[in-house]
From Swiss-Prot:
Listed transmembrane segments: none
Keywords per UniProt: Ribonucleoprotein, Ribosomal protein, RNA-binding, rRNA-binding
Lineage: Bacteria, Bacillati, Cyanobacteriota, Cyanophyceae, Gloeobacterales
Stated name of the protein: Large ribosomal subunit protein bL9
Any single GO BP term: translation
Function comment: Binds to the 23S rRNA.
Family membership: Belongs to the bacterial ribosomal protein bL9 family.
GO cellular component: cytosolic large ribosomal subunit
Stored Pfam families: Ribosomal_L9_C (PF03948), Ribosomal_L9_N (PF01281)
Record-linked NCBIfam families: L9 (TIGR00158)
Amino acid sequence: MGTKIVLKKDVDTLGKAGTLVEVAPGYARNYLIPQGLAVKATPGLVKEAEFRQAKRREIEAKHRADALETKKTLEALGFYEVFAPVGEDGNQLFGTVTNQDVAEVVASKAGITIDRREITIEEPIKRTGVYTVKARIFQDVVATLRLQVNAAG
């Protein structure tokens, strides 16, 4: 039987601060509590932790609903056009289209800022044409964007 503790700080393997978790007694007694990462759960702390978790779930549900609305908006706008310099043949790009380029195009067309690190380009975009990229908006909410790469000029 484990020991119930309330985390005082975020612990990668257990959860976020304020979370009620059950761990092995030795782990709690010898590591988590002495390091100041957790405290032994008392009835008052358990009640407070449950209240915080309910609040966190409520806030997360609101963020998820907002993210789903944003996804719908982004996907409804159709193609996002990117203009890039091309070589002699008219198809081969100088360089590639990057996550930053996609983020800037989305911001200018949709007015929605997406962190470039949340944009996934499956294969390097080195030619003009139509491509699909994914933008992670919130945890597991991912928008699929269609990108039209055209020659600049």
